[in-house]
């Protein structure tokens, strides 16, 4: 059931099957351990089961978050609670709770806010055994504070029916978005609440340089009707026609198309684009450190990532032993067709870049930045 408070939702998942619990009482691991978790230490599993519970803050889509938490509970007999929060909301929450977090692990969402948390010493380093499954060390933090699980491509989603009705061509480049003909037709997300928006800011700075990027955002803002709370917000508005052009991750657009919105076209910007690494991490000072470590090991296995596409998430996976979602390639996406994104610059400067973004826009945009 849901427990709603402020902007947060929390679901208590049911306990694992009674048989699993009985086996655990007698010191036996559930049979499911023999699947993809075979490299996980028996001592870690036992220590995690003794703690008995885990709280997850999730920044991926809730359908996948719920499934991943339920799978972990079924595998290990550990009670899981979760909250679905945007990445910036998680960062704000753990900053306020520094040293005594109410959650144990962070799951999903772009790594720009994760890197802010690394810089603020809010994440616990952990050398995961299953990190050997990563296709490249580029998909983990150099200090082992977070590990990547998926990769999402940034781009545009457009409502082809509305564009045709308006007699407009679809934008093909980032600069196209500033054309006067798109006034009031575009939605982005709010960098105060969504890591996706921070990625957009970093991407433009890396592609254009800082000052030119700020001028770009001033021009783009004239065409933006709303900055949504969630990074996936624009994708959900395109199909129904609430916005004509949404900027966000293209896997969110795939989900909308498969939900029946065949009026959506996905566009990879011709002048280049960047990507998110969706990650997972342990909060420093968490109440259940062994269960948190076990979660990291689990997240780096097919048991966790292969169920993403079964639950509406079609990002590319960054584990060598995972099965890529065929839907991503069917819609023409290429996980390697991206710029060489500078994560260090993003980590060191994103807070200042967000301040500069709002300073460039001034007060005129305030009522368009959604927080609910």
Locations of regions flagged by a protein language model:
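Alpha-helix capping/helix-boundary segments
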Residues: 19, 112-113, 234, 252-253, ...
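Mature extracytoplasmic/periplasmic domains
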Residues: 274, 278, 283-341
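A ligand-binding cleft/hinge motif common to bilobed small-molecule-binding domains
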Residues: 112-116, 244-263
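Periplasmic-binding protein-like
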Residues: 152, 216-221, 227-228, 260-284
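Short, low-complexity disordered leader/linker segments with a strong preference
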Residues: 1-51, 366-372
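Extracytoplasmic ligand-binding site segments that recognize negatively charged/polar headgroups
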Residues: 55-69, 81-97, 101-242
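A short alpha-helix/helix-coil micro-patch that ends at or immediately precedes a cysteine
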Residues: 68-76
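Conserved C-terminal helix/tail region of periplasmic/extracytoplasmic solute-binding proteins
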Residues: 337-372
């Amino acid at each position: 059931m849901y427990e709603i408070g402020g902007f947060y939702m929390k679901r208590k998942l049911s306990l694992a099957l009674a048989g699993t619990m009985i086996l655990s009482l007698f010191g036996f691991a559930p049979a499911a351990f023999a699947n993809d978790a075979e490299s996980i230490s028996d001592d870690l599993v036992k220590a995690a089961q003794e703690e008995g519970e885990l709280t997850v803050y999730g920044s991926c889509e809730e359908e996948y978050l719920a499934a991943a938490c339920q799978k972990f509970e079924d595998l290990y007999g550990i009670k899981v609670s979760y909250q679905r929060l945007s990445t910036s909301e998680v960062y704000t929450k753990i900053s306020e709770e520094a040293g005594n977090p109410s959650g144990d692990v962070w799951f999903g969402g772009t790594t720009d806010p994760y890197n802010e948390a690394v810089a603020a010493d809010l994440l616990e380093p952990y050398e995961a055994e299953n990190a050997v499954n990563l296709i490249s060390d580029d998909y983990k933090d150099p200090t082992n504070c977070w590990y990547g699980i998926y990769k999402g491509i940034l781009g545009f989603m457009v409502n082809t029916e509305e564009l045709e009705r308006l007699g407009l061509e679809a934008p093909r480049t980032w600069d196209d978005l500033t054309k006067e003909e798109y006034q009031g037709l575009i939605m982005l997300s709010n960098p105060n609440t969504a890591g996706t928006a921070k990625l957009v800011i970093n991407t433009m700075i890396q592609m254009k340089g800082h000052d030119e990027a700020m001028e770009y955002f001033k021009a783009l803002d004239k065409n933006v009707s709303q900055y949504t709370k969630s990074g996936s917000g624009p994708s959900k508005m395109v199909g129904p026609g609430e916005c004509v052009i949404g900027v966000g991750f293209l896997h969110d657009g795939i989900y909308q198309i498969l939900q029946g919105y065949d009026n959506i076209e996905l566009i990879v910007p011709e002048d280049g684009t960047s990507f998110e690494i969706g990650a997972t991490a342990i909060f420093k000072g968490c109440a259940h450190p062994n269960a948190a470590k076990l979660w990291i090991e689990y997240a780096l296995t097919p048991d966790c990532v292969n169920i993403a596409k079964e639950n509406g998430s079609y990002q590319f996976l960054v584990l060598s032993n995972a099965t890529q979602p065929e839907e991503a390639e069917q819609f023409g996406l290429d996980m390697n067709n991206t710029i060489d994104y500078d994560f260090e610059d993003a980590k060191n400067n994103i807070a200042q870049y967000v301040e500069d973004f709002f300073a460039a826009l001034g007060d005129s945009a305030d009522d368009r930045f959604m927080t609910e």
